C-alpha cells in the first residue's frame, strides 16, 4: 500500500482509554506517581521521559502485567480492576515490547499469524481433521495477515525466519503481529529504539 493510499482523515472521538491517578511502587522505589491521562478514539498519544521514568511500567499497568497500588484504568467505560494481558488482548488492547518478543525461527508471516490466535474459533477436532470451519478460518487469517504484510511493505521477506532479518524489519514484524489482533488500542513500547534514521522515518509513516 503506497503512502497516498493510507487514509489519515479519521475523526477524533471521545475517550476510549482513561488512566486515573495511577501510582506504582516496587518496594520503596516509586515507578509511577499519581499519573493521569486519557486517549481519544483515533488519537496518537505519546508518553515521553528518560530511561527509568516509568514509561514501560505504565503500559504494563494498562495491559495487566502490573497491578498499580493506586488509581484505575478505564477502557470503554469499564474499570479494568482484575485484568490480565490475555484479557486485555481479548478486549482489544494490543502491544509491542521494548525488547523484541518474536519467534526467531518462524517466518515473518507465521509470527504475524500468531496475532490472529484471539480470532480463532476452530477447536482441536476442527483443526486436526481440517474440517471446513478450520480451513475457512485459516484462509481468512492468512488473508488478513497478507494485507498487513502489504501495508508494512515486507512482502519480500514474509517467508524469511525472523532471526535472520535486520532489527528494523523485526520491529515491523512485531508491529504486524500486534495489528493482526485488530486492536482498538495499540500500545507501542519504544517503537523506534535502536533504529537508524531511515528506519525511524518508515516506522513513523506506518504508525
Locate the predicted segments by residue.
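Glycine-rich phosphate-binding loops of nucleotide-dependent enzymes
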Residues: 2-207
Amino acid at each position: 500500500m503506497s503512502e497516498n493510499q493510507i487514509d489519515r482523515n479519521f475523526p477524533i472521538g471521545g475517550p476510549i482509554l482513561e488512566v486515573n491517578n495511577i501510582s506504582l511502587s516496587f518496594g520503596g522505589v516509586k515507578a509511577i506517581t499519581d499519573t493521569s491521562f486519557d486517549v481519544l478514539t483515533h488519537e496518537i498519544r505519546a508518553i515521553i521521559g528518560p530511561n527509568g521514568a516509568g514509561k514501560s511500567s505504565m503500559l504494563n499497568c494498562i495491559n495487566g502485567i502490573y497491578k498499580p497500588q493506586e488509581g484505575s484504568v478505564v477502557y470503554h467505560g469499564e474499570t479494568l480492576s482484575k485484568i490480565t494481558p490475555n484479557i486485555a488482548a481479548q478486549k482489544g488492547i494490543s502491544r509491542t515490547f521494548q525488547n523484541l518478543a518474536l519467534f526467531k525461527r518462524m517466518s515473518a508471516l507465521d509470527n504475524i499469524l500468531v496475532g490472529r490466535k484471539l480470532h480463532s474459533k476452530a477447536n482441536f477436532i476442527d483443526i486436526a481433521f481440517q474440517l471446513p470451519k478450520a480451513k475457512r478460518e485459516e484462509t481468512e487469517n492468512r488473508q488478513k495477515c497478507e494485507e498487513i504484510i502489504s501495508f508494512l511493505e515486507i512482502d519480500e521477506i514474509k517467508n524469511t525466519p525472523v532471526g535472520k532479518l535486520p532489527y528494523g524489519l523485526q520491529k515491523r514484524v512485531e508491529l504486524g503481529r500486534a495489528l493482526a489482533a485488530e486492536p482498538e488500542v495499540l500500545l507501542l513500547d519504544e517503537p523506534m529504539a535502536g533504529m537508524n534514521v531511515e528506519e525511524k522515518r518508515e516506522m513513523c509513516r506506518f504508525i
